[in-house]
Amino acid sequence: MAGHSQYANIKHRKNAQDAKRARKFTKLRREILVAARSGLPDPEFNPRLRSALANARRFGLPKDKIESAIKSSTDKTEGDYQEVCYMAASSGGMWPSGFAVVVTALTDNKNRTASNVKHILSKSGLVLADVSFMFESFGVFSYPKSTDFDKLMEVALEASALDIKTEKNHFDVYCSRESFAATSLELRKKLGEYEHSGLVWRAKTHQEVPPEVHVRLEKLVDALEEDDDVQRVYTSILTERQSEK
């Protein structure tokens, strides 16, 4: 029976991992679809699509699914997805004072997504609230640590970048959302292809919290990301998981 129990546990973990992978692929495909519709369906002339494709390859989305998503962008019967953003703040003692969350989603049914996200947040001791003053929204481009930092700094300045952050495995170059396309072109022209890029939210100040709060935060992020419509979750508590997105 012990052997059976071990097999059941392994099977359960594998099924959970497979479900998580399938959800991720669905979200990546949707991201490509929306990006392709936002401009030309050619990544050379559509930085947002280029970013979505790089992200898809980074997470292993098969080539046939990538091509299918781009082709489907012209199909009117394929979901009419809209970008939505939800913000929330702590409503009690479960979280430290000033804790805030930003959730971005792509949905074809705003009422469904709003209901699901609000339910998850409420169960976790959070209420919908405008916390935009606690965050900044940027374009970000990631280059490997092997990149010459002096050259990166020089090109970033020429491209009107706002900041460069040194992360564990890469350098992140930040720009305004409005200059995302122009900065992308300048960086690629002078530094070559970046590893990945995107439009992100970043807390102006990150909170330091004890380990038990990090555990609670991981559960919150997991619950939100299990929703098929949710694309990204950003919080005022920095985790390694957030810095890798």
Curated annotation (Swiss-Prot):
State a single Pfam family of this protein. TACO1_YebC_N
Annotated stretches, region: Disordered:
1-22
Give the InterPro entries listed for this entry: Integrase-like_N (IPR017856), TACO1_YebC-like_2nd/3rd_dom (IPR048300), TACO1_YebC_N (IPR049083), Transcrip_reg_TACO1-like (IPR002876), Transcrip_reg_TACO1-like_dom3 (IPR026564), YebC-like (IPR029072)
UniProt subcellular location: Cytoplasm
* GO annotation, cellular component aspect: cytoplasm
* One term of GO molecular function: DNA binding
Q: What is one Gene Ontology biological process annotated in the Swiss-Prot or TrEMBL record?
A: regulation of DNA-templated transcription
Keyword Transcription regulation annotated: yes
**Source superkingdom:** Bacteria
Which UniProt key words apply to this protein? Cytoplasm, DNA-binding, Transcription, Transcription regulation
Which HAMAP family does the UniProt record give? Transcrip_reg_TACO1
Q: Which family does it belong to?
A: Belongs to the TACO1 family.
The name this protein carries in UniProt is Probable transcriptional regulatory protein NSE_0641
